[in-house]
Amino acid sequence: MARILVSSVGVGNENREYRKTNYSIEGNTYENIKFLASAINEHYNIDKFFLIGTSKSMWEEVYSNFSNKKNSYDENTYNDLKEEIILSGENAETIDLSCVEEALGKGSKIYQIKYGINEAELIYNLEIFMKLSEILEDGDEIYIDITHSFRSLSLYMFVVLNYIQNVIDKKIEIKAVLYGMLESKDETKPVVNLEIIYKMIEWIKGANEFKNYGNSYTIADLVEKEIGRAHV
């Protein structure tokens, strides 16, 4: 069993930067954070990272952030990676991000996707997302961060993880769906858990099974889980 964070990486501002922000997760404050993934990692003690982005995403800053935490940062590696990303075209297939995966830690993976501006790119992205099913294992706990990058990625994550759970039948659990409210006027930005949206999908599925087939197993399982949470 592993705690896995699935998160997306955007391109930042025109200077390829995310501004440092203070985040609050369940009452705990994390200061001067560039990537919400860093705060989530500290708060939930994440074991592995599965990061998703395009060839233009801020991979060099991901490398800098996580390699500095491990005292393995190398200036030449950072500069070479940044140059490769800047020089790559928007339609570049993939770039070598092995140094970023190494900085993230053992078992972490990076998935490079397209911009999704046409059906071919959307299908390509879906195939990339489906690779998650090959490495997720029974018992894994999934934390989803939808703060950065394309909003469409959130839909991909919901659909694919729901498919992995219910069709491929991997015994994974969605522990949290997290969104850092950068638009908040508060100095410390709240991180909200949108897990209720994922729960609604499960309840809709259970209601459909009961309505059309008289099958109450899914609803009974969901009720049991809610009772269990209430007694924690």
Model-based region annotation:
Residues 1-141, 162-229:
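Long, low-complexity, Lys/Arg-enriched
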Residues 142-159:
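Elongated alpha-helical scaffolds
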